[in-house]
Amino acid sequence: MHTNKKYLHTSGDESVLKGYKPVIGLEIHAQIKSKSKLFSTSSTEFTNSMPNVNVTLFDASFPGTLPSLNEYCIRQAVKTGLAVGGKINLYSQFDRKHYFYPDLPLGYQITQQFYPLVSEGKLRIDIPQGDGTYKPKYIRIARIQVEQDSGKSVHDLDNTLIDLNRAGNPLMEIITYPDLNSSLEAELFVKKLQFMLRHIGTCDGNMEEGSLRCDVNVSVYNASAGDHPLSGTRCEVKNISSANNIPRAIDFEIKRHIELLTNGQKIEQQTRTFDAKKGETLLLRSKENIPDYKFFPDPDLPYVELTEDYVESVKTTIPSLPDDIVEKLTSEPYNLNFYDANILLTNNGGVEFFETILHDSRWSSKLNPKLVANWIASELMGLLNASEITLSDSPVSYIQIGSIVEAIQHEDISGKMAKKIIKIMFDEKSGEMALDIAEKNGWRQITDKNVIGELCDKIIAEHPTEVGNLRNGKENVFQFLVAQVIKLSKGNASPSLVNQILREKATNKPTTTD
């Protein structure tokens, strides 16, 4: 998963930390992908509907109405728990969390405070080290509990309007341990989880539509003084609705905490919100005003009891998981680098596109997996992203990409000409193969040794000083001479043959090949 390139993370910067270290935990609310709500038959659609059309009497809390559990939501939560390696609790229960808000008509939220459906999972993130390598880190997940969403309040200058379309929508609250130590790690975790949920089909992960929301808990401790990592006072930032705002909110909090502590002040336990325009967090309430939710088991709902057979049946519906796919791509026989493997994984259909190219029987020789992956991840995806087109709608087919790689491997075209060819494929959408385009434009690579020899002779004759320097051991001029030969061939001479033949002719020494 890729980080926000436009945002410079500061929570790993020692000049900012001043001996302190951050401790971060996340609470992520993911709307379960289900056609109907958690305890009613209403549709879960709320973004494209008129207000208050997907509301049953129970959703609106009419007296005498009772909840009826949607079993499919339990199945989806179990699937999520298994995907993160969690323990599926065969016994769980629903509890009431009491608080008043206009868009919560029941006066309480139905959640799983005491006995959640899932406990003790983990999710791996891969942290870039700045040198092209990645360091894996496992973030523990304390619990996944199933609960209902609230409605939506719309405010203007004079009124607050209530839309209950979202009220009762099924949520998974995914709570991590405080294992994260930077805003970068938090961003990586959320994006990895977002992709995982989409991949297994349990949440669409659309933060901009509110189906994935994040609360962050941030504290710092004085590592240079040997303080315990959990000795700091945490503050919670609620309802961050953009993956790119998560590191911004965290870094602001880290700086705020450190500034207070270095000035001799104490951190107050607070609940805050993030103002994306200002790039800062704002106080919502302090510890003294934290409500007592008066949790107790919901008397209208039975315990949720599962069997081992039920859990096993859910397990069979889980596709290959992202980490397993990356492991496959970075191992024999593919041996891709981590970056290219992730590009293929995170672009829908990318792995299938890659493997279809490699396994097609039309190629005269085996294609290099690394070269195929690079042409998809760098060249094709670069064109697609610039035009905001997905891989599934690519005007360049897998056969055309394969034809480019085959032509490069056979030295029929150069890498430079191949980039021109894929641009023509992309723009003209003609379906032509690489060699056809190369022939039409005079871009076939020159591999005739006699022709290349004549080009080398001409450059040697035109640059006697440089050739003399080369013969006297000044190797730095050799690449200059190579470039002149390539230029003379209009970019079509085989670089490997130019290197070999030019060196033989310029130094009067035959090159040896293994």
From Swiss-Prot:
InterPro entries: Asn/Gln-tRNA_amidoTrfase_suB/E, Asn/Gln-tRNA_Trfase_suB/E_cat, Asn/Gln_amidotransferase, Asn/Gln_tRNA_amidoTrase-B-like, GatB, GatB_Yqey_C_2, Gln-tRNA_amidoTrfase_suB_CS, Gln_synth/guanido_kin_cat_dom. The keyword Glycoprotein does not apply. Keywords: ATP-binding, Ligase, Mitochondrion, Nucleotide-binding, Protein biosynthesis. Pfam families: GatB_N, GatB_Yqey. One of its GO terms (biological process) is mitochondrial translation. Its EC number is 6.3.5.-. It catalyses: L-glutamyl-tRNA(Gln) + L-glutamine + ATP + H2O = L-glutaminyl-tRNA(Gln) + L-glutamate + ADP + phosphate + H(+). Its main location: mitochondrion. Gene3D superfamilies: 1.10.10.410. GO terms for cellular component: glutamyl-tRNA(Gln) amidotransferase complex; mitochondrion. It is found in: Mitochondrion. GO terms for molecular function: ATP binding; glutaminyl-tRNA synthase (glutamine-hydrolyzing) activity. This protein may be expected to contain an N-terminal transit peptide but none has been predicted. Allows the formation of correctly charged Gln-tRNA(Gln) through the transamidation of misacylated Glu-tRNA(Gln) in the mitochondria. The reaction takes place in the presence of glutamine and ATP through an activated gamma-phospho-Glu-tRNA(Gln). Belongs to the GatB/GatE family. GatB subfamily. Subunit of the heterotrimeric GatCAB amidotransferase (AdT) complex, composed of A, B and C subunits. This is Glutamyl-tRNA(Gln) amidotransferase subunit B, mitochondrial. It comes from Naegleria gruberi.
